[in-house]
Regions:
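Short S/T/G/P-rich N-terminal loop/turn motif that feeds into the first structured element of a domain
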Residues: 1-62, 66, 72-90
């Protein structure tokens, strides 16, 4: 079942933008369906859509966690995974 993932990255928009393309190159093959971001209080809010919670968890615990550690970004403490009734990217 597809899921919507929301979280706040504990980094500024400039740092996020410098890492954005590298992370998308890893996220797409891992199953990312849609990615969006916005500024919130000097940090970066994320809304992503994934094909399943398992796909999200594999990415979050692997490439995302490693990338954040290398960039010295603290893990988000507000991750919310919401199962979707329907998702259509057309």
């Amino acid at each position: 079942m597809a899921v919507m993932v929301t979280l706040t990255l504990k980094t500024d928009p400039a740092t996020y933008q410098s890492l954005h393309e590298q992370m998308l190159e890893l996220a797409r093959p891992a199953g990312l369906l849609f990615h969006s971001s916005y500024e919130v209080g000097g940090q970066v809010g994320i809304v992503d859509y994934w094909p399943s919670e398992e796909a999200w968890n594999a990415f979050a615990r692997g490439p995302l966690a490693q990338g954040m550690k290398l960039a010295k970004i603290e893990p988000p403490d507000d991750v919310k995974v919401t199962p979707l009734i329907y998702a259509d990217a057309r």
